[in-house]
From Swiss-Prot:
Predominant localisation class: virion
Compartments (UniProt record): Virion
Keywords of this entry: Capsid protein, Helical capsid protein, Virion
Ranges for region Disordered: 1-33
Protein's name according to its UniProt entry: Capsid protein
The family this protein is said to belong to: Belongs to the closteroviridae capsid protein family.
Pfam families reported for this sequence: Closter_coat
Organism: Lettuce infectious yellows virus (isolate United States/92) (LIYV)
């Protein structure tokens, strides 16, 4: 009996199955290899993982806030402020360094008492006075606000953005008792009497050095703003309630 044909058939079948098995194994291996490539092709492995800790420690990153002046813009603001002082001097004299510092502190006091609303540009009846030793200067609030805005047109409400950039300095000077809130703006914004000296309308309450009193005053003002004109009732809230406050009106 000739079995060569059968052997050829069976042999061919075995070869086919073996080839199929090989292809399956190759596919599995390819999938495994690709998965390994994908799993290791992440940001850390490709970039940071190839940098030593020593090199990483040398990297310095600074990202500007979108709602506050950058360090360069703060410098531009100060230069414009000095020019404002010179332009308002009857003899156009350059102000002394001491008077410039007094002016800066005076601006801090102004934004605490009057706030940083763009409407200050229309406050022609309001003035602020600075003095150092025998030097005294008085300026109209509207003149100052409009002058600064005209010099820094790319920064909406530049006085507010400047105050936000200088918030830590303002808080330090306030803590030292050099400047204090008169409480009028805070009261108008619904802040309780015990928190009024901690309130600033330009603060957003995100800083690590933000005190509980500052945060509470800010949230009280937000509560007042949410309910203003909506018939909201007058209520007292504790800090935890305010932190969880959604639109109540």
């Amino acid at each position: 009996m000739d079995t060569d044909g059968d052997n050829d058939v069976f042999g061919s079948g075995n070869d086919t199955r073996n080839n199929d098995d090989k292809k399956k194994e190759e596919m599995k291996q390819n999938i495994s290899d690709n998965s390994q490539i994908i799993s290791t092709r992440d940001h850390e492995a490709d970039i940071i993982g190839s940098i030593s800790k020593e090199d990483l420690s040398k990297i310095v990153v600074r990202v500007d806030r979108h709602d506050a002046l950058s360090a360069n813009d703060v410098q531009s603001f100060r230069e414009a402020m000095i020019n404002f002082m010179r332009d308002k001097d009857p003899n156009r004299n350059q102000p002394s360094d001491k008077l410039i510092i007094a002016m800066e502190v005076g601006v801090y006091q102004m934004v605490i008492n009057l706030g940083t609303s763009a409407k200050l540009g229309n406050a022609n009846n309001l003035e602020f006075t600075i003095a150092y030793d025998q030097e005294t200067r008085t300026y109209k609030v509207a003149d100052f606000v409009n002058y600064m805005q005209s010099r820094m047109r790319n920064s909406p409400n530049v006085v507010r953005q400047y105050a936000r950039a200088m918030e830590k300095t303002i808080n330090n000077i306030r803590s030292a008792g050099i400047i204090n809130s008169n409480g009028v703006l805070a009261a108008k914004h619904g802040v309780l009497a015990s928190y009024r000296n901690s309130y600033s309308d330009f603060a957003v309450g995100f800083g690590n050095d933000t005190t509980d009193a500052q945060l509470t005053s800010l949230m009280l003002a937000r509560k007042q703003a949410l309910c203003k004109g909506e018939g909201g009732s007058v209520e007292h809230y504790n800090t935890m309630q305010l932190a969880n406050l959604k639109h109540p009106c």
